[in-house]
A protein has these predicted regions:
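Assembly/oligomerization interface modules of large self-assembling protein complexes
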Residues: 1-58
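N-terminal short leaders/motifs
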Residues: 4-10, 85, 188-198
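Short loop/turn segments at secondary-structure transitions that flank enzyme active sites
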Residues: 89, 93, 146-148, 246-248
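A short, structural micro-pattern
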Residues: 56, 134, 234-236
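Residues in well-ordered beta-strands of folded domains
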Residues: 23, 51-53, 61-63, 141, ...
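Sequence/fold signature of self-assembling virion shell proteins
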Residues: 156-266
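Extended, solvent-exposed, turn-rich assembly/linker loops in the middle of proteins
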Residues: 103-174
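Alpha-helical scaffold segments that mediate packing/assembly in large oligomeric complexes
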Residues: 59-133
Length: 266
């Protein structure tokens, strides 16, 4: 449905009753300079294990008239597909809230905000991750509401370079900014509304040297989607209940291996 979760989260899928184990990077080994023969301070183990023990349940329960079902006026497969989609939306809304609650406690260069996309604020955040990665710029990932504003920060006033004009016209965004690849968030609208699924006012800085296990957003899915069905003779209805167990948490070790810029205008 979207590239949001795969881009920002460390996701594990376990069987029923199993616990997801996440390894969180800690401060790691340090080196010290001292007089010859002196005792060197010890370095702590470079990672710890975090377990998401408790899971939550997201459920949906579509009901259909039995006669309509038997006469093929309603396709149960379509109802189940719609129910599963609504469950996924509910899960993602919860996971996004978990992340949002955490990131607003972070400080620069991992979290910053401004009125619009402020070059003087965003650029130091990009440079931080370039240094962290040994020269590799982070990806800039966000809704087109944010990524489309990056062209204005390129330093061209009144007249853009031809390449930027072509990129902006073809994709709605420029391809790179300060060496960072600009990636559009796939942000579908919630059914029967004009409300996007994910925040439109955040630009995520995703460092390329970080694998999924280092991301602070941890998500676990316990088992597959289960279904239970029943037929009711009193009102001639048929129903299916779908359940999925999941949970999310933000766990920060030595640092949050992601950056977030928020536009306070939106």
């Amino acid at each position: 449905m979207s590239n949001w979760l795969d881009t920002l989260a460390d996701v594990k899928r376990v069987g029923y009753g199993d616990k997801a184990q996440f390894h969180v990077k800690q401060e790691g080994i340090r080196a010290y300079i001292q007089a010859k023969g002196s005792t060197t301070a010890r370095s702590k183990v470079a990672s710890k294990t975090f377990s998401l023990d408790d899971t939550l349940s997201v459920s949906a329960r579509p009901v259909v008239n039995l006669v309509e079902l038997q006469t093929n006026q309603v396709a149960m497969a379509d109802l189940i597909r719609d129910a599963a989609y609504q469950m996924e939306l509910a899960e993602l809304a919860y996971i996004q809230k978990v992340l949002n609650d955490a990131i607003e406690t972070w400080e620069k260069p991992y979290y910053a905000e401004g009125t619009g996309v402020v070059k003087a604020t965003l650029d130091p955040m990009v440079r931080h991750w370039v240094r962290m990665s040994g020269g590799q710029a982070p990806a800039l990932f966000g809704d087109i509401e944010m990524t489309s504003k990056l062209a204005e920060l390129t330093g061209f006033n009144g007249q853009y370079a031809d390449q930027l004009i072509v990129e902006q016209n073809n994709a709605g965004v420029i391809g790179t900014y300060l060496g960072s690849k600009v990636v559009n968030l796939i942000n579908p609208l919630i059914d029967h509304s004009d409300v996007p699924t994910f925040d439109c006012n955040k630009l995520y800085l995703v460092p390329g040297f970080v694998d999924a296990s280092m991301r602070p957003l941890k998500v676990v899915y316990e088992g597959d989607v289960t279904s239970t069905e029943a037929t009711h003779i009193d009102d001639l209805t048929y129903e299916v209940r779908l359940d999925q167990y999941f949970n999310a948490a933000v766990v920060v070790g030595d640092r949050p291996y992601i950056g977030v810029y928020r536009d306070t205008n939106n």
